[in-house]
Amino acid sequence: MSFSFHEKTFFDKYGVRVSLLEDEDFIRAASMLAEEVFGFGIYKESKGSGGRFYERCWLMGSEDVLYGRVHFGGQNNTILFELTGTGCGVAKEGWESRLFAFLTNAIRPKITRVDIAKDFF
């Protein structure tokens, strides 16, 4: 699953609790959001370019498993979250409702990709 929203959303969500002056400030806010919604946050910046036409990329999960990516920089001041199937599977219960509540109040929210699979055994 992938979704994006405008970076100004963090000003409304966190207000003065979070300094939002540098890219790293926005990434800290993105990690806080991921922790609140999914139960895991960002653990390191990815090497190389950001991908998806963004300037930079950060990884969610751990050294052993990738739960998703957060892309930031460029793209009309938006931030893009990409969750892997593993990330969706390990997210804390109720993440769908928490994400819906967040996106409902976000600035310029957009669900950019949803993958659905059905296993037949």
Language-model features, listed with the residues they occupy:
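Structured, helix-rich domain cores that form ligand/interaction pockets
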Residues: 1-121
